[in-house]
């Protein structure tokens, strides 16, 4: 991943110069078509400062930090930043001039870093019965940007409840009113990740008379099933275009390697589905105290660790995944750590049935490189053998041919040592498995275990298991491949 070129002193100087420059020259007015083209291909980063999340971004506004962060996002490959505003913070029903100036500054700073802006309105909002003031507030806030090509789209409400009749009535009136103010501005609404495709279908059906320009999918499901989930969401809103406006996984309970693999799978699945815009949540982790304490979000430990960067601005491995996806259009299988050479924090391998024997990474007996995985003194859990498990970056589709292999070596090995591919439906229901040849018991040299299979009907994901159970001796694994 490329390194950020600016240092603090240079950055402050650059920012001060930027603030003293005259206003930017007038831009050519955008069309709905030009904005929609930008929306469907945007490299969007979700953003709050690491020390000032949600409403604190505005109440504790720090233009120098915003400039530094957006410069970092641009070097990562982002070309658009999502900016979220809050009626209660900005002033409602009349926006405060002080806060609209802060918004204008953020848009200017984004432009200075080569970034467009997607605006989200009415976050942390439930005042759906106040339609008239909602319309007036939105029109006042958006009027300066109606013909500003730096603002490419507006999400009217973040994660609207699709089964709330009052909320839907509010949206039905807000959509045409905003269009009178900004007729070339693409408009969207989102539902939460739990509602998913079902919620999107419900929303679309209820807005048939006031349709949205595109749909924005918030995806936090199992990444190995992301292609099936993305296609289900597309089907729910077809033929209206769809982008992925939020996706990611927290590192509070999983490794940073798992986060990197998660995003690699989503980017690759989106490309397969023809979705050209994927927006990771979020640029930074959040420091303790950075999320407003009056919010439910602040009580959820996972919310503090979704960032591509840690709070000290150092990158997690997921940052390199996003960098590659945005700047080269590719996602590498190297994130899977198939040779066990990565640091533990950067490995996406997970333990399955560790109570029956957990694998450890060791330098004792590598086949290639300097490390391998070792099982010793394992048992079993019912019919299940302990294993290391991962899933490929390439999405699964029924009828595909798959091959997996790994090299194993035994030292006084007993029991069963094999690899397997386990297939699952879109809902995570196990379908079947295919297993490899087994490693001979006793002492053995490095032996290739391999399995070939066709993804069965209904398969949406596959797990690769490296197993060793009922083993009173030791088994080493190295040099795994799956394709």
Segments and roles (model prediction):
Residues 30-212:
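Active-site mouth of glycoside hydrolases
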Residues 1-28:
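Secretory targeting and sorting signals
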Residues 327-483:
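Extracellular and organelle-lumenal recognition/adhesion modules and their flexible linkers in secreted
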Residues 267-339:
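Aromatic- and carboxylate-lined catalytic core of secreted/periplasmic carbohydrate-active enzymes
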Residues 41, 50-57, 288-289, 317, ...:
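Short, solvent-exposed loop/turn elements at domain surfaces
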């Amino acid at each position: 991943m490329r390194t950020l070129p600016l240092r603090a002193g240079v950055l402050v100087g650059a920012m001060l110069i930027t603030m003293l420059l005259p206003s930017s020259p007038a831009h050519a007015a955008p069309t709905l078509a030009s904005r929609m083209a930008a929306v469907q291909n945007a490299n969007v980063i979700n953003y709050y400062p690491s020390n000032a999340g949600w409403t604190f971004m505005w109440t504790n506004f720090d233009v120098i930090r915003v400039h530094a962060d957006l410069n970092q996002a641009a070097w990562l490959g982002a070309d658009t930043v999502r900016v979220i505003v809050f009626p209660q913070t900005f002033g409602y029903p009349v926006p405060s001039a002080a806060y609209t100036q802060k918004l204008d500054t953020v848009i200017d700073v984004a432009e200075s870093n080569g970034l467009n802006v997607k605006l989200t309105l009415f976050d942390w909002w439930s005042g759906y019965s106040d339609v008239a003031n909602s319309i007036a507030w939105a029109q006042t806030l958006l009027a300066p940007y109606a013909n500003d090509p730096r603002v490419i789209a507006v999400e009217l409400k973040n994660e609207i409840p699709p089964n709330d009749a009052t909320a839907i009535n509010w949206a039905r009136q807000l959509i045409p009113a905003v269009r009178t103010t900004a007729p070339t501005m693409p408009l969207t609404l989102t539902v939460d990740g739990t509602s998913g495709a079902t919620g999107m279908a419900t929303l679309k059906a209820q807005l048939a008379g006031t349709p949205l320009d595109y749909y924005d999918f918030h995806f936090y499901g199992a990444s190995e099933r992301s292609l099936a989930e993305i296609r289900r969401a597309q089907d729910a809103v077809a033929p209206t275009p769809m982008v992925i406006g939020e996706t990611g996984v927290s590192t509070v309970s999983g490794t940073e390697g798992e986060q990197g693999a998660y995003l690699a799978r989503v980017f690759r699945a989106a490309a397969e589905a023809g979705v050209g815009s994927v927006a990771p949540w979020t640029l930074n982790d959040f420091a303790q105290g950075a999320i407003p304490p009056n919010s439910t979000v602040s009580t959820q430990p996972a919310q503090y660790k979704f960032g591509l960067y840690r709070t000290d601005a150092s990158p997690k491995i997921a940052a390199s995944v996003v960098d590659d996806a945005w700047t080269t259009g590719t996602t590498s299988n190297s994130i899977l750590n198939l040779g066990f050479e990565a640091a533990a924090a950067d490995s996406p391998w997970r333990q399955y049935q560790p109570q029956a024997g957990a694998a450890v990474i060791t330098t004792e007996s590598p086949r290639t490189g300097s490390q391998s995985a070792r099982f010793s003194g394992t048992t079993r859990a019912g019919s299940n053998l302990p294993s290391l498990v991962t899933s490929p970056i390439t999405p699964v589709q029924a009828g595909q041919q798959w091959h997996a292999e790994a090299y194993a070596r035994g030292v006084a090995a007993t029991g069963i040592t094999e690899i397997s591919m386990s297939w699952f439906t879109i809902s995570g229901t196990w379908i079947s498995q295919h297993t490899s040849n087994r490693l001979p018991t006793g002492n053995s040299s490095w032996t290739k275990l391999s399995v070939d299979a066709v993804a069965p009907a209904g398969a949406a994901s596959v797990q690769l298991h490296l197993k060793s159970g009922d083993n009173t001796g030791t088994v080493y694994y190295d040099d795994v491949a799956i394709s």
